[in-house]
Design a protein with these regions (language model features):
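Short, conserved active-site entrance elements at the starts or edges of catalytic domains
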Residues: 2-34
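Alpha-helix boundary recognition
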Residues: 20-21, 67-68, 106
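A short local loop/turn or secondary-structure capping micro-motif enriched for an aromatic residue
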Residues: 48-49, 61-64, 92-93, 140-142
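Charged, gly/pro-rich active-site loop segments
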Residues: 1-8, 81-153
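A generic local structural motif
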Residues: 12-15, 39-41, 59, 110
Length: 153
């Protein structure tokens, strides 16, 4: 099978931003502090143009790991059109999340953690590194963001 021609960096960034704006779910990977076991879970998210907002039970492995380490790695899209995002994380209680943000999250994802008896936390993820590629011919130049700054115009 011959892959399609490699996209330009500008097209990859455009496709990545489209996916962030329109996709609903992302794979969230975490690990416990001090080399703890890795953990992977799909969660719904909202992109506000600068950060991703997710929610998970405070006492879940993902919630505990995010609080303890303040870091995550996300996988967005299918394996042959993947976006990998490494980010720093800020925990936000439902009480501290602006009402408008909670409403946007519930509206886009169809899920409102504020309505549940289980204690949830929201997490804002600030991307630090973004990579995107489809096939082997896009491995070179896959890095779109480094140190929190887009390197692709």
């Amino acid at each position: 099978m011959t892959p399609p021609p490699a996209r330009t960096a500008e097209q990859r960034k455009k496709d990545t931003l489209h996916r962030l704006e329109h996709d609903v779910d992302v794979w969230v990977s975490t690990a416990g502090p001090d080399g703890g076991a890795p953990y992977l879970v799909p969660l719904s998210f909202v992109w506000d143009g600068a950060t991703l907002l997710i929610a998970t039970p405070a006492e879940s492995p993902t919630g505990r790991n995010l609080v303890a380490t303040g870091r995550t790695r996300l996988g967005l899209g299918p394996t042959r059109d993947v976006v990998l995002i490494e980010g720093t994380v800020q925990a936000v209680t439902p009480e501290d999340l602006p009402e408008e943000d909670a409403e946007v999250f519930a509206g886009k994802t169809g899920f409102d953690p504020r309505q549940l008896s289980t204690r949830y936390l929201y997490f804002r993820i600030l991307p630090q590194r973004v990579q995107a590629w489809r096939e082997e011919n896009e491995l070179r130049g896959r890095e779109l963001m480094r140190d929190g700054t887009w390197i692709t115009p």
